[in-house]
Amino acid sequence: MKTIPWEVDASKLSNAYIAGFLDGDGSIMATVEKRPDRRRFPYRIRLRVNFTQHERHRKLIEIIQKFLGGVGAVRREKSHQLVELVIQDRYSVEQVLKRLLPYIVLKERQAKIMLEILEMYRKATVNTRSSVTEKEYVNILMLVQKIRNLNSRTGGKVNLEVFNPVTTLRKKTKELSQRNKG
């Protein structure tokens, strides 16, 4: 089978190739969203792994999705003519990162931190419901800030604020991390 230079023969894909693709045209992101409902913690943590390409390479993104076990969703971003494979289910994110971690070079620190966050959530899960303590929640937010600092686009320019759900005091994560060190 003759391929166009940017096409990939699916039989030649490997974990190393996909990890290189993630390093170059992917992202490992942790975002914090304010919860509209009144839950115990005012923010929801979203963990995400993306693979992005120009829309003319949609087939490659679909091949990667299939190689990774059909996880995530392929989405089209019309305004920039992009397609992306978005993986945000925690279990799928964890499985993909564990599978690719030995081969990730540039985003290795983000991957390790995200796996640490996922481990904290898994340990705190009881009957499919998260039972994260307040201290674990603050630690997770600090790890999210580390990922944000490592990602060049966010650059950690905006510090996350941690709200104490009991007293509603605002404390910047830098202050919290200094207390945890000392």
Model-derived regions: residue spans:
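Sequence-level preference for short, compositionally simple segments enriched
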Residues: 1-182
